[in-house]
A protein has these predicted regions:
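A generic structural signal for tightly packed, nonpolar segments enriched in small/aliphatic residues
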Residues: 1-158
Length: 158
């Protein structure tokens, strides 16, 4: 059971359900999820890098290498139980938000609760890289960040 302490953090509830559902019904070999999950990732990495969280070093390193070749900037952040502890509750299994420090990591740790230990998983927080603002060289709108890297990863490792 999840204690909802912040109704504005609803996306992680849905994403957690989807992660569990996908494992249960589709039996994937690995999982990628991409979400504009936290504004805090913009504070951490700006609008140049996507935040990458993974429970599997090999899978993550393969993907980061593909990102580099694809010119899609990505930076790995830790999945650390110290941050996950911020989700503990005395009245439920966990809460949907933790403290203000490391909140992108805390959000990823929330999602980690819905991923089976043996399932290789990458969470990409793309809040900073998902949208362009209009400049001389770009139009206002979605960037499609991750499409090239995901395609190249699947082509190389599937």
């Amino acid at each position: 059971m999840v204690q909802v302490n912040n109704t504005d953090a609803e996306g992680r509830l849905l994403l957690g359900d989807l992660l569990w559902y996908a494992q249960l019904h589709f039996k994937p070999k690995r999982i990628f999820d991409l979400a504009t999950l936290t504004g805090a990732i913009i504070i951490a990495l700006g609008k140049e890098y996507a935040g990458v969280f993974s429970n599997n070093d090999k899978f993550c390193n393969e993907f980061l290498n593909v990102c580099k070749k694809s010119n899609e900037k990505a930076w790995r952040l830790p999945l650390d139980q110290k941050f996950g502890d911020a989700l503990s509750s005395s009245v439920s299994d966990l809460t949907n938000v933790g403290g203000s420090q490391g909140s992108s990591i805390i959000a990823a740790m929330f999602l980690n609760n819905f991923v089976k230990k043996e399932m290789p998983w990458i969470h990409l927080d793309i809040a900073g890289v998902a949208k362009n603002t209009e400049t001389t060289f770009s139009r206002n709108g979605a960037t499609a960040w991750g499409v090239v890297s995901l395609f190249e990863y699947l082509r190389e490792f599937s």
